[in-house]
Amino acid sequence: MSICCAIRSVSYTHLDVYKRQDYTYYPEILRPSTGFPAQLPVLLSEYHFYDRKDVEDYLTLLSLIPSCFDSVLDYETNKINEGLFLSDTQADTLIADLNTFCDNSSEHYLITTFRNKVAELPDLTAEEQASYYIENEAAFREYVLPAYEALRDFLVEHKGSGSNSAGLCYFPDGSDYYAALVYDATGSSHSIDELLEMTEKQRKSDLLAINGIAASHPGISLTTDDFPMKDATPEEMLTCLSSAITKDFLPPVSTDFSVRSVDSCMQDSMAPAFYLTAPIDNISHNVIYINPRSHYEGFELFTTLAHEGFPGHLYQTTTTSASGCAPIRSILNYPGYVEGWATYVEMLSYSYAGLPEEKASLLMHNQSALLSLYATADLSIHAKGWTLSDLKDFLSDYGIDNKEAVSEIYDYIVAEPAHYLKYYIGCLEFLQLKDYAKETFGDSYSDKQFHQAVLSIGPAPFDIVKKYLRDYYRQTI
């Protein structure tokens, strides 16, 4: 059986789970960071113009946004009728974000980015460019802005219709839905209890390593003032990473990339950083966004760029494409593989930063332990019914006592179920795959071949990656 057939078989099996229970109105498309309203403006701003037809198609697309938002409102109305509407806390967050988006309409970045892209088209006259500028601004004010305002007004009107401000397990059939969601998000076949056990085991291992380093290096700390690239630009860091990774990875495919800042009107609702997946017909068009609101700089920016760039998302996307992965697979979404890979290699990047080995190891284990706390919280809030009080008790055991910060963590996990799991559980699955490869190939094992093999397989549930790992590994020899 080919890998495409195997993926199709698993996908149909997974769909059967959803068919057995009607989970139609359980998903929330208005999630604060990863939901439709937050993601759409970025996709529109990155809609690439190769010729005038692309410009005209884009303007036509804007005219369809009101009907798209009408469908969103219909869906949310049905969620209200099913007793599955979002909580007041989530509604307040979304309303604030939508207000920010709408209040920046005088010189909105969807207007300015359009102008910049049109200005770069060489076959347009100045008059034609000016005409398109006018059309776009009119379309923004006629279609885009009213759609976002209608969504905001809907949330204001229906705030209070939600019945659950805690985990998914408090909804009818919520525990079963969460289990299905976890599989969808992670690609891991392990049960909820097994995932909790895996997470705790890795956390204990990381904390043991931290204690060992601290004992053998008195006075060592988590500060990174000695990071040699603390004043480097993001582009300089990415160039450094593309060279440094070659001891563990094949050299990156020749490609272009750019680093951009999230616009001010979207900073509150966007992630600290993200890689925008390159188009399948222009795999060299790679864009990484940094959110200024996160205030990432120095070492933290370096590891973030490793996650988003080399050897993270950018490297994975371009390498998998160059390996001949069927383009049709790009329509399938396996976030556990994609984010798990980026988190796994982010941990490796600590050794590329030019810090003393013991300092790099301390920082890496500390970050891994921190991510494990979020994973345990996600699983426990949505599957075990943890309240805010339970989360406070859990995190206080690890020295996290800031009540406001803990409350924000709780609210975010409630609003974005399984979000942290695709990163952390995905990372653990890659670590388990590495252990399996070492055991299977013995003296012939190398990290470089392992990395190339899993990237050649491409995004898939982890059982499938493991099934095909032996064959793809041999092809790298």
Describe the function of each predicted region:
Residues 1-477:
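N-terminal maturation segment of proteins
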